[in-house]
């Protein structure tokens, strides 16, 4: 079965429809009055369809725009962790360098002091 329903009538077709008269048939004025109500309903349905179609288009466009913004935001978020990682790595290297300077610098100072003492001791004996 087809999921899409097709509208077979429109307000103009309903208005132009003429019925044959038969003996003891329906009252033509009553039929016309009822068909006028049907026409108003069809017009209301068409207005609702037009409004909903416009809303649907507007919302579809909004979803597309938000998806574009989300994609752009995701690409920015991908760059930020790399920058943060680079900054963190730089900080770690800086701290490591300071620690090496502190630890090995003290040893170098001790070694330089010992070397100077030996040189001084050696020059005293000369």
From Swiss-Prot:
Main location: cytoplasm
Pfam families found in the cross-reference section: DivIVA (PF05103)
Compartment(s): Cytoplasm
Coiled coil: 35-72
Keyword Cell cycle: yes
Record keywords, A-Z: Cell cycle, Cell division, Cell shape, Coiled coil, Cytoplasm
One GO CC annotation: cytoplasm
GO biological process: cell division; regulation of cell shape
Protein family according to the UniProt entry: Belongs to the GpsB family.
Function recorded in the entry: Divisome component that associates with the complex late in its assembly, after the Z-ring is formed, and is dependent on DivIC and PBP2B for its recruitment to the divisome. Together with EzrA, is a key component of the system that regulates PBP1 localization during cell cycle progression. Its main role could be the removal of PBP1 from the cell pole after pole maturation is completed. Also contributes to the recruitment of PBP1 to the division complex. Not essential for septum formation.
Oligomeric form and interacting partners: Forms polymers through the coiled coil domains. Interacts with PBP1, MreC and EzrA.
Listed name of the protein: Cell cycle protein GpsB
Source species: Latilactobacillus sakei subsp. sakei (strain 23K) (Lactobacillus sakei subsp. sakei)
């Amino acid at each position: 079965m087809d999921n899409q329903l097709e509208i077979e009538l429109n307000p103009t077709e309903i208005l132009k429809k003429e019925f044959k008269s038969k003996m003891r048939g329906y009252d033509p004025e009553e039929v016309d009055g009822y068909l006028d109500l049907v026409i108003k309903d069809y017009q209301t349905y068409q207005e609702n369809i037009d409004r909903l179609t416009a809303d649907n288009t507007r919302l579809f466009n909004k979803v597309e725009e938000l998806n574009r913004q989300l994609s752009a935001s995701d690409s920015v978020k991908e760059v930020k962790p790399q920058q943060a990682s680079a900054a963190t790595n730089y900080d770690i290297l800086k701290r490591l360098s300071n620690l090496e300077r502190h630890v090995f610098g003290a040893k170098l100072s001790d070694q330089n002091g010992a070397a100077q003492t030996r040189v001084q001791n050696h020059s005293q004996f000369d």
